[in-house]
A protein has these predicted regions:
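Mid-core helix/loop region of P-loop NTP-binding domains shared across ATPases and GTPases
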Residues: 148-180
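Major-groove DNA-recognition helix of helix-turn-helix-type DNA-binding domains
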Residues: 1-5
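Hydrophobic residues on the short alpha-helix immediately C-terminal to a glycine-rich phosphate/catalytic loop
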Residues: 14, 56, 80-84
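Phosphate-binding P-loop
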Residues: 53-61
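A short, Lys/Arg-enriched interface patch at domain edges and termini
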Residues: 9-24
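P-loop NTPase motor core
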Residues: 33, 38, 48, 54, ...
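Charged, amphipathic alpha-helical linker segments immediately N-terminal to NTP-binding catalytic cores
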Residues: 23-42
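Walker A/P-loop nucleotide-binding motif
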Residues: 62-80
């Protein structure tokens, strides 16, 4: 099933902890198929994988390939990274203060919420023909860039880059420009 329920006392006995966590009648769900880090941490049992953040910061590889079978938490791990690094209006550090990454030191805490993050998934771009798939991919890219609308008024981008984003927003870019 998509919503396996594990009795709370069983999990705490296994983990050797008595820390209570509010849930649905004392029973929390296992987050099968949920890819939202914030939702999983708030409402489900979560095995702390935040040391992945430390590993990524320390190793500084230019490219990282996550290879795991289906349903092994790749998308959830990527959403955790996005939640950790992304600069947002709301304070997302609350989702990490009781996790292992927070006890690793100030070096890592300073990086929390410090960067604009582009996170793209094509999981919903499934169509039977290339033309529809291509339009869906363009929309995913455009929507992700538009999430960072603060760039339109910042000094971060030069005028050509601001024009590019403006034309992306109004769907005026050519196929060649999208490939840029």
């Amino acid at each position: 099933g998509r919503n396996w329920m594990v009795p709370e006392e069983t999990v705490y006995a296994y983990l050797g902890t008595a820390k209570p966590k509010e849930g649905n009648g004392g029973i929390l769900s296992c987050a099968v198929g949920n890819t939202s880090y914030m939702d999983v941490v708030k409402n489900s049992y979560y095995v702390d994988k935040t040391l992945l953040i430390r590993d990524l910061i320390d190793d500084q590889f230019p490219v990282i390939l996550f290879t795991r079978p289906r349903r092994f938490g790749k998308t959830l791990a990527l959403d955790m990274l996005k939640t950790f690094f992304e600069k947002t209006k709301e304070d997302t550090s609350i989702y990490f203060k009781d996790k292992q990454i927070w006890s690793c030191g100030e070096k890592y805490q300073k990086m929390q919420g410090a960067f604009p993050v582009i996170s793209i998934t094509f999981k919903d771009a499934k169509f039977s023909d290339w033309a529809s798939t291509y339009v869906a991919i363009k929309n995913v890219i455009r929507d992700e860039f538009m999430r960072h609308d603060e760039l339109f008024t910042s000094d971060t981008l030069n005028p050509a880059e601001q024009d590019y984003l403006s034309r992306m927003q109004t769907d005026e870019l050519s196929d060649v420009e999208y490939a840029r």
